[in-house]
Amino acid sequence: MKVGFIVILGFLIHSDELIDWGVIGHRTVGQVAAQHISKKTQIAMEDLLGGASLAYISTYADEIKSDDQYKAYNPWHYVNMELDENYDSSKKNSKGDIIHAIGKCIKVLKSKTASKKDNKFYLKLLIHFIGDLHQPLH
């Protein structure tokens, strides 16, 4: 009985680590992604990101979450819906979700009028959210 309790307690204590990508997960996704982009895209991204790697940038959106200036972006890390629903039929969060966020990031990056600062910010978010999207239970 004691062993079972200790095992369950261990899982509960570390449960956030079990369902959370964390730095290593995001950086792994960033590194893998970097190996699959065209040279043209790589050059454009390096210019925009000041030479920082996709792996390094991939954690940016989590790093800014606790800053009050960026709190509005917190719901963009995930989407909630019932198990028997698909995204189109699910109730949407009025503050946005990861699907909305990816669309917004792409829209800014495609815009001819977006500033370099905005392009850099939304590219960093996009890199992170693609990693979040591929994490089960996120």
PLM regions with names:
Residues 17-129, 136:
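N-terminal, motif-rich segments that launch catalysis or mediate targeting to/interaction with membranes
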Residues 1-24:
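Bacterial Sec-dependent N-terminal signal peptides
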